[in-house]
Design a protein with these regions (language model features):
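Non-transmembrane, aqueous-exposed alpha-helical and coiled segments at domain scale
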Residues: 1-191
């Protein structure tokens, strides 16, 4: 994106004082994507065959150029850092339906550098050298694109969302289950 995507810049673009923000909802895809060059630990977690399957399922190609986006499993380490930088209160998790065809779903829960676990995301460290620590979760292997209530989701999909909540220490309040505006699950009370 050519504009600043931090939550602190939203009021500036909207023409309202930033002190008027009551909530910040961090928006995260159910898997990781990256546009452009630079370190991206998630890209190397599962290999190019897995990445290509995910890229096709999620339609992860540049809107203007058609170039394939870099993809990988959900990265809890990078996401925790992003949520902290945003000052997010809650999370909207998008594209959960894209993972529906997977028997197992990898999640990056940590990094190792030279065999030693890295305690936190450091944007100035050797991110191009870190190795992702991957936890495999069961997939649900069924179409969830019609789900609009939490109780309609398969147990494995709910477990995936709850696993991410625990890893991120944030509530996931919204879960999108399709590209259409009405295809989302409100989990819990509205903000």
């Amino acid at each position: 994106s050519s504009s600043n995507t931090l939550a602190a810049y939203a009021p500036l673009g909207a023409g309202i004082p930033n002190c008027k923000l009551d909530h910040v909802v961090g928006v995260l895809k159910a898997y990781s994507t990256c546009v452009g060059a630079g370190p991206f630990a998630a890209e190397n977690a599962m290999g190019e065959v897995w990445n290509e399957q995910l890229r096709k399922a999620g339609g992860e190609y540049g809107a203007a150029t058609g170039r394939p986006r870099r993809v990988g499993p959900f990265d809890c380490v990078a996401s925790r850092y992003g949520l902290a930088m945003q000052g997010a209160d809650k999370i909207a998790l998008t594209k959960l339906d894209v993972l529906s065809s997977l028997k197992e779903i990898p999640v990056i829960t940590g990094y190792k550098l030279d065999g030693v676990e890295v305690p936190a995301f450091d944007p100035l460290s050797d991110l191009d050298r870190v190795e992702p620590v991957v936890t495999m979760l069961p997939g649900w292997e069924q179409d969830i694109s019609g789900c609009t209530r939490w109780d309609e989701l398969p147990e494995a999909a709910k477990n995936y969302v709850q696993f991410l909540e625990k890893q991120l220490d944030h509530e996931i309040q919204f879960v999108s289950t399709g590209a259409e505006r009405e295809k989302f699950v409100l989990k819990g009370a509205w903000l």
